[in-house]
Amino acid sequence: MKRTIAIVAGGDSSEHDVSLRSAQGIKSFLKETEYVTYIVEIKGTKWEAHTGNGLRAKVDLNDFSFIDNGTKVKPDYAYITIHGTPGENGILEGYFDLIKLPYSTSDVLVEAMTFNKFALNQFLSAQGVNIAKSVLLRKGQAARPTDKDIINTVGLPCFVKPNAGGSSFGVTKVKHAEDLDTAIDKAMAESPEVIIE
């Protein structure tokens, strides 16, 4: 009997479409003789299984099932291809743990820790791992360090990126001090926290 694999894609970040392309690639690699595969697209609270011929079915979040051609489908495994939230920060993994569905990524704690770049750096530093000096900025922060203080801490060139997010959007390599504010604004458009390293 073939196992049913849900290739979970989309997500809530700017990398939604990139994730869908990744899912298509994975689907093409899985042998149809061994697996029944569905792409399950997530965008906010809208979860839909692509059931073929452009049709989609709403996913029942009670058990991650959906109806395909009159038959209830409950995947045996979730292959997570979401770039960013909720696939790389532990949220989706926590849901799958609750419904006891095996999945392809690390567990909740590892995903949550590694998704937050600043928290991971602090953890690794405490373990004796050398890490780059960094500054964390938060949207609406009352007392933000000056550009001069940031550059004195991390040096130039530096990288400005969303603290919790992928590595494709909102990332800038800053070579000149006058470009720092623009880079921070770009990263803040992707995440309420920005890390500068």
Region annotations inferred by a language model:
Residues 3-9, 13, 21, 113-197:
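Active-site nucleotide/adenylate-binding loops and adjacent lid/helix of ATP-dependent enzymes
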